[in-house]
Amino acid sequence: MENVDWAALPFNYHKTDYNVRISYKDGKWGEPELTQDEYISVHMSAPCLHYGVESFEGLKAFRGADGKVRLFRPDENGKRFAATARKLCMAELPVETFVEMCRMVVKANERFVPPYGTGATLYLRPLEIGMGAFLGVHPAKEFMVCVFVSPVGAYFKEGIKPIRVIVNPDYDRAAPRGTGDVKCGGNYAASLEAGEEANREGYANSMFVDAVHRKYIEECGAANFFGIKDNTYITPKSTSILPSI
């Protein structure tokens, strides 16, 4: 890519050359295939549109000082992707297939990997959706996994700098024993109102507390929380937050 101000690149979707897809039907996965189609065709009664039968992941590819492109722990994202599928009664994509698809899509779009030292990266967004046509509330039997990429800058406009967040006990991100420990869209939809309110008050995001005692820090709508005390890395002890990678 030419004439791109990588240092000013926003965290947003930018068109690339390819995405990679794989379908699950009749109890088995097909083969990953590259495509240039940016659109997914689904039936209007597909469960991903009605019952939240969908999941996603987020990881990055980095260009090193040596010019090589590297993915950061894609196998761990693959394991988390499978854990979400189990929770939502979706077909589990094998971790090795997940990693293979990530490598395929990065290689096919290597010209979009930002240069080393710019602060920009190539973001990968794997997603799985329940397909097919039915109305009842029950697990789907057909699925599709797609992995697309986009060059991005920092998620928060402040960049790699401290941000201000507000702790607002009036909102719950996820219910205890619910889906808080997996990466499904419903968790993020539930965080939007709190996030918008935080933005209106001048904060970068909202920090959620636990839904039981309403006083213990859990995580932000878009990021985990951790602290350092006596040179020890500390994260909240909760079963309703997403395991970090």
Regions found by a protein language model. Give the residues of each.
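Helix-start/capping segments and mature chain N-termini
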Residues: 1-101, 105, 135-245
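Charged, gly/pro-rich active-site loop segments
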Residues: 97, 105-117
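Intrinsically disordered, low-complexity linker/loop segments enriched in Gly/Pro
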Residues: 108, 130-131
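Extended, Lys/Arg-enriched charged tracts that mediate electrostatic binding to polyanionic substrates
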Residues: 114-125, 129
